[in-house]
Amino acid sequence: MNWKGIIFLFITSLSWSQNFYLKAEGSSLNETKVLDSIGYTKKHTSVQSIIDENKSLGNQLTQAGFLASQLLKNKKANDSTFVFYYSLGTKTQNLKIKTDLLTEEIKSTLGLTTDRIVLISETESFLNTQLAILERKGYALAKLRLENFTQENNQLQAFLIVDLNIIRKINSLVFKGYDNFPKGVKKVYERKYKQKPFNQELVKNINRDFNTLPFVIQPKFPEVLLTKDSTQVYIYLEKRKNNSFDGFIGFGTNEEKQKLQFNGYLDLNLFNNLNSGERFNLYWKNDGNKQSTFNVNLDLAYVFQSPVAIKGNLKIFKQDTIFQNSSFDLDLGYMIRYNTKVYLGIKDNTSEAIQKVSTSTIKDLKSSFYTTTFEHRKNNYENDLFPEQFYLLTKFGIGSRTLSSEKSNQFFGQIQALQLLPLNTKNYIHLKSDLYYLQSPDYYTNELYRFGGIKSIRGFNENSLQGNIFGGIFAEYRYIVASNLYVHTITDFGYFQDKANTTSSNLYGFGFGLGLLNKGGVFNLVYANGSSNGQAIKLSNSIVQVSFKTTF
């Protein structure tokens, strides 16, 4: 390489403040075409940049198989253009990587039972692939190199040398920042990762697992401490504030009973307050007129420091002075991951006709089911406006109903799903669906599935509809106006069948809404109008729902 010429060009160009141009030419027209095809950078802001590009071009020629290429000379064509003349020599197509110096154990580990022939341009990729194989098997500090290069019949040959070092296994997970991190969760992840062969992919998996936990934040990526005889992974955690409250309570006088009557609603979610990964939900609503709902739910995670989960739910629903339903669910589950669970359980329902007046559609009855449930959710807490990305719940139950000491076999199935589809950074499609089916010899109003309202098909009062079959899809187009504000449309479709009252109908809900995020929580406003069986939409039937969910 003509370094004296390059130094001269550098010195004579120090005073210039302009663009410089590099031109590479070969010993023939074909060689010049090869140089152009490599795609070197021609425009530069300094002579030093041209010198660096020359080094890069030399490396690219070597990788392309021109092992004997050399820079013959360079010259300054004018004040801003420098020409470099190359001789490329004969192109070597292949490299034969010989494995004679490898032990049988290393050959077996890498799957290299014979010599391997690769393109010169793919040599680096081949070595990186072999290094990744060793790393996955725990040889985190392994090194690979090629030695003793020889040329034979236009083919380059070299011996592969592998320095394995020792197998690295994760000895411990060290938790920093959250001293009261749930012991059950900690034990499960320690059992999952301790003594596993250490590699970078495993560290990424650890990071991914802890990012899925809704009650912690990882302020930085896990770090690894390698000592002579141990491998420790340091996981940095902070407790996330994930409790929420939404509701209001009012009171008035019941004109019929002349008694004080409370109305309003309350939706309270408590998450990991006992530092065990538990979730508690209390929901109460009384519209002051015909309906009241009380629902309490408790999820326990990693019980006895194992993948066991326990979930219990109590729900009481009262319809005016007509009937009252009580249901109790108890499930024992296995946690595939924190957000992926399967359950086996029991479900008991009791329904009582309050007025004790026998009708053809409302009866005192009890039912019991053995159930199986699958639940999976995916959240992205870096997305403040739309943290819930995906949700799937499937629940099936088989059992019997008792009515006047007469038993009837029953079966039910339910599928609920949610999917957030990002179109780009400002536009999203939000889809929810709810499918329910009850199979029975006959049906009564007070045992049917109830739906309608802001969490179901919008434009209808909450729980104002019922059916033994229901299917609905609830769609929103969401547009982000600002980092803390979005607006959305409402397009809901549904169908239900009510065999207790021999009716069925298509349902439609249309409207719009907005969501506003602030330091205290999320404010939501929804305006929706519903219709059934193609009836005309009337503005007088519109429903406006306002909520403010506070996080703490």
Language model segments and positions:
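Amphipathic hydrophobic-ligand
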Residues: 139-144, 325-327, 411
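Bacterial Sec-dependent N-terminal signal peptides
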Residues: 1-24, 552
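Gram-negative/organellar outer-membrane beta-barrel architecture
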Residues: 199, 206-393, 450-453, 463-467, ...
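Short, hydrophobic/amphipathic alpha-helical packing segments
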Residues: 54, 127, 372, 414-415
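Select transmembrane alpha-helical segments in multipass membrane proteins
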Residues: 34-35
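Periplasmic polypeptide-binding modules associated with outer-membrane biogenesis and secretion
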Residues: 18-29, 38-253, 267, 281-288, ...
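C-terminal transmembrane beta-barrel domains of outer membrane proteins
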Residues: 17, 263, 295, 390-552
